[in-house]
Amino acid sequence: MNERRNDIDNARAILIAMVVLGHILNCANPGYSIIPYVLVREFFNAFEMPAFFLLSGMMTDGEKWRRRSTGEYFVRKVKTLVVPYVFFECIAIIYKHFILHTISLTDGLCAMITLHCNVGSDWFLPAMFLACAFYYIYIRFPYKMGWGISCVIFLLMLHFLTPVEGRYWQILLFRGILGFVFMMVGNLLKNQLANLNWKKIGCALFLTAASAAICFKLSLDNSFYSGVLCAPALYLISGTCGASFILGLARRIPWKWLAWIGQNTLVIMGTHQLVLYTIPGNSSPLWVAGVFVLIAAVETAVVYLTNRFCPELIGKKRKEPSYD
């Protein structure tokens, strides 16, 4: 079990690095005019967020939670998702009000409560909570064939669901349902994903790149954030194959520090954009590399401090002191 846990943590570390680099490239290329940056971003977009949900579906122990009460399940999700969301949002409100002077405290609190988020990437936490709520129904009623068919229906439904201005709840629901679909994919394919040789990894990479290229060429947008699903089949392929590619690589990387990064993915997800809100943008590759290093340094400090002084606020348990 420890080996598998490390593999998942390694995969999450690679994925969060892609998320950070993708956001840096967005700042470096706001007009989407620098083609190499656009291509890298499109490739990442094809699978990075689906992969997080897919990995969560792989790791959620249905047998364990069927033996426990509904209350225990949701208390766990509140501790690991809702509490970190509020914590990261409060950090953002304080930072953006007192340091950047870009929002009022009232506007910041309103954005947090209505789930509009003061940090763009914080949308992931409410979406994961909603996806886990849907997933709990599957845990209680584990009929794989029926739920597999239901996921296809959900994808088609999301494809025809057009976001309406002023109806933010619609986008929230979209994210939760789409996240649930990829959690289901992770659960249904966990045995296949447990055995990935180099041939399968290469095939997964090819299918991911091909799907991303088709979507880019035909301007087919698939986005958790925007609540748009123009090509359900391609997004399902790229999300699943991309996650397989990353997971296959992760299983072949023995570095302990990479697993440590993966264990602190939520902290990095919830705070790294504050650095980007602070510094002026630039399109230079040197700037991109420099900002990535800067964020890595800042996040190392943030991760250490949060783990040391307030682990409960980032969804972790406080370690008991050892007197051995």
Please name every model-derived segment.
Residues 1-324:
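Alpha-helical transmembrane segments and their immediate juxtamembrane cytosolic regions
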